Amino acid sequence: ERHVGRKSTNNLNLTCQWGTCNTTTVKRDHITSHIRVHVPLKPHKCD
């Protein structure tokens, strides 16, 4: 998860640093879900 990091040590904002994205969230699970925009992971095979 090297593309996810805190903007600074004085706040709780998590920033996506994938390319030029820079999407910011306050919860780790939100940024983890956001990363799926960049990684086309399909957990289930379509029929």
Curated annotation (Swiss-Prot):
PROSITE patterns: ZINC_FINGER_C2H2_2
GO molecular function: DNA binding; zinc ion binding
Superkingdom classification of source: Eukaryota
Record-linked SUPFAM superfamilies: beta-beta-alpha zinc fingers
Renumbered zinc finger spans (C2H2-type): 14-38
Any one GO biological process: positive regulation of transcription by RNA polymerase II
Subcellular location: Nucleus
UniProt xrefs under Gene3D superfamilies: Classic Zinc Finger
Family: Belongs to the pacC/RIM101 family.
Protein name: pH-response transcription factor pacC/RIM101
Classification of source organism: Eukaryota, Fungi, Dikarya, Ascomycota, Pezizomycotina
